[in-house]
From Swiss-Prot:
Protein name: Actin depolymerizing factor ADF
ADF-H domain ranges (all copies): 4-118
Highest rank taxon of the organism: Eukaryota
Protein family: Belongs to the actin-binding proteins ADF family.
Length: 118
């Protein structure tokens, strides 16, 4: 199911900085109205990255693992149903714009699902 969600230009620009310049290690994206935008980014480790994800809401993220850039669909089990559906149906729109991120998203529902990023 396609959502028709737009992707803000800054998402691609920040991703390229992560991929090429390595100025940040991770980026968290959120849906704002009908567009995917950058919410925050950081240079810290996996623990800092996990701390940047909301406990009760969905997000997209990318994390530079060194040998690959992992795309993450963060949908905690306690997030409302509508955002979970919106994020799930919108991930391909963002993935298509982020050239170099893993094609298969790591779908995480709890912090333990993010253990492979350590």
């Amino acid at each position: 199911m396609a959502s028709g969600m737009g992707v803000d230009e800054n998402c691609v620009a920040r991703f390229n900085e992560l991929k090429i310049r390595k100025t940040v290690k991770w980026i968290v994206f959120k849906i704002e109205n009908t567009k995917i935008v950058v919410e925050k980014d950081g240079k810290g480790n996996a623990d800092e990255f996990r701390g940047a994800l909301p406990a009760n809401d969905c997000r997209f993220a990318v994390y530079n693992c060194g040998n690959k850039i992992q795309f993450v669909l963060w949908c905690p089990d306690n997030a409302p149903v509508k955002p979970r559906m919106t994020y799930a149906s919108s991930k391909d729109a963002l993935l298509k714009k982020l050239d170099g991120a893993t094609a298969v998203a790591l779908e995480a529902h709890e912090m333990g699902d993010l253990a492979p990023l350590a």
